[in-house]
């Protein structure tokens, strides 16, 4: 599975966890069916293990917004991206940023992709 697909599936699992208060294992199983992808699982598990810290990074970068007012898709995507940016050294920030914008265009809308771009641009240093 390519990393883009792993990110999309991780987003879907995180969305299910957020929306339905589903367990991490159940969400991964629902999304992956009989497949397995270590990177996708690493993303979902990493976001959930560091969710409070990730939210604390996101919140101050939301101009005139509160984290609880974000759509579940946008919040899940921001968490996923911040996890990659802050916790994974093998993913350049610009790659994570660009992937997030492209995925937002698929799962959200143009306005959300611009919003996500703005938030992540404040969080992600260009040089990693």
Curated annotation (Swiss-Prot):
Keywords: RNA-binding, Transcription, Transcription antitermination, Transcription regulation. GO terms for molecular function: RNA binding. It comes from the Bacteria. GO terms for biological process: DNA-templated transcription termination; transcription antitermination. Gene3D superfamilies: NusB-like (1.10.940.10). One of its GO terms (cellular component) is cytosol. It holds the Pfam family NusB. InterPro entries: NusB-like_sf, NusB_fam, NusB_RsmB_TIM44. Belongs to the NusB family. NCBIfam families: nusB, PRK00202.1-1. Involved in transcription antitermination. Required for transcription of ribosomal RNA (rRNA) genes. Binds specifically to the boxA antiterminator sequence of the ribosomal RNA (rrn) operons. This is Transcription antitermination protein NusB.
């Amino acid at each position: 599975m390519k990393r883009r697909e792993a990110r999309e599936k991780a987003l879907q699992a995180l969305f299910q966890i957020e929306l339905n208060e589903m367990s991490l294992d159940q969400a991964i199983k629902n999304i992956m069916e009989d497949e397995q992808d270590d990177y996708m699982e690493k993303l979902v598990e990493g976001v959930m293990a560091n969710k409070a810290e990730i939210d604390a990074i996101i919140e101050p970068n939301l101009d005139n917004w509160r984290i609880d007012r974000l759509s579940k898709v946008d919040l899940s995507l921001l968490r996923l991206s911040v996890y990659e940016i802050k916790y994974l050294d093998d993913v350049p920030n610009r790659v994570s940023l660009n992937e997030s914008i492209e995925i937002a265009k698929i799962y959200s809308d143009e306005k959300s992709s611009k919003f996500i771009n703005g938030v992540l641009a404040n969080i992600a240093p260009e040089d990693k």
